[in-house]
């Protein structure tokens, strides 16, 4: 019973009067950032690789593919 009493005392001390105030708290905390900031951050992301990076990735992939092919031949 003491757990319930402590929870009740904490609820009374918080100043909330029910669920209707909880939604307001959630909306206020999520409104700190706006969509303009998000759009700018997303625009700053660079998902395109430069030509040098693509060539390096292709050559390493081709080399690993050749090594796997040779290993498969030696196992047979």
Swiss-Prot record:
The keyword Acetylation applies. Transmembrane segments: none annotated. PANTHER family: CAMP-DEPENDENT PROTEIN KINASE INHIBITOR/PKI. One of its GO terms (cellular component) is cytoplasm. The inhibitory site contains regions very similar to the hinge regions (sites that directly interact with the enzyme active site) and 'pseudosubstrate site' of the regulatory chains; but, unlike these chains, PKI does not contain cAMP-binding sites. The arginine residues within the inhibitory site are essential for inhibition and recognition of the enzyme active site. The lineage of its organism: Eukaryota, Metazoa, Chordata, Craniata, Vertebrata. The gene is PKIA. The record marks 16, 19-20 as: Important for inhibition. Keywords: Acetylation, Protein kinase inhibitor. GO terms for biological process: negative regulation of cAMP-dependent protein kinase activity; negative regulation of cAMP/PKA signal transduction; negative regulation of protein import into nucleus; negative regulation of transcription by RNA polymerase II; regulation of G2/M transition of mitotic cell cycle. Belongs to the PKI family. This is cAMP-dependent protein kinase inhibitor alpha. The modification N-acetylthreonine is found at residue 2. One of its GO terms (molecular function) is cAMP-dependent protein kinase inhibitor activity. Residues 49-76 are annotated as: Disordered. It comes from Homo sapiens. Extremely potent competitive inhibitor of cAMP-dependent protein kinase activity, this protein interacts with the catalytic subunit of the enzyme after the cAMP-induced dissociation of its regulatory chains.
């Amino acid at each position: 019973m003491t757990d319930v009493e402590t929870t009740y005392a904490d609820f009374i001390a918080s100043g909330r009067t029910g669920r209707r105030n909880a939604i307001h708290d959630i909306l206020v905390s999520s409104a700190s950032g706006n969509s303009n900031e998000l759009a700018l951050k997303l625009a700053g992301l660079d998902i395109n690789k430069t030509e040098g990076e693509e060539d390096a990735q292709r050559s390493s992939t081709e080399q690993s593919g050749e090594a796997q092919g040779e290993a498969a031949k030696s196992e047979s």
